[in-house]
Amino acid sequence: MKILHCADLHMDSPMETHMTREQAAKRNAEILMSFQRMTGYAENENVRVVLIAGDLFDGERVTRRTVEGVLDAVRRTPQIDYLYVSGNHDDQTNAFADQEIPENFKRFTDKWNTIKYGDVAISGIEITKNNASALYEQLPAQKSRVNIVMLHGQISSACGVDQVNLNLLKGKNINYLALGHIHTYSCEQMDRDGIY
């Protein structure tokens, strides 16, 4: 089973600190096109699941055109599931309001949920101020051969919104911790069983 992991696309970010409004609009169009190309790549490579670990959009500024562009790309690849956990820049409620969400676009909420694909279990949760401390004890125990956990936050020794306490996830039978928020690729050993 092939899985593709992405995060922090920040679609429709204003980007006007270092760019003119026209340059920012062009860059945002390129980011949407990159997402659409990624879905085509996933289709060509027979990817079964795309993990979107937060900050797909950049706050309330996201346009209807961008949301429709994302959902159209998802609809064009119905054989691929897109698992999405929102991040600190996402405004999930407004972005998807009045949109028909395709069946293959699955959103994690502020409660743990697990989706299974044969012997692979993928669990995810949106970190909020109400669950930031308790989510580590509430992580569903999975007996699958491969266990993946999706979170959006910075590696930390604390528990809070936008923070992932790596120490509290060690020894929990996690094979891959799919993170967002960090804006850089890395692959580190989490414990003897897993990487992040």
List each model region and its residues.
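N-terminal active-site segment of His-dependent metallophosphoesterases
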Residues: 1-68, 141
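His/Asp/Glu-rich metal-coordinating catalytic cores
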Residues: 49, 58-196
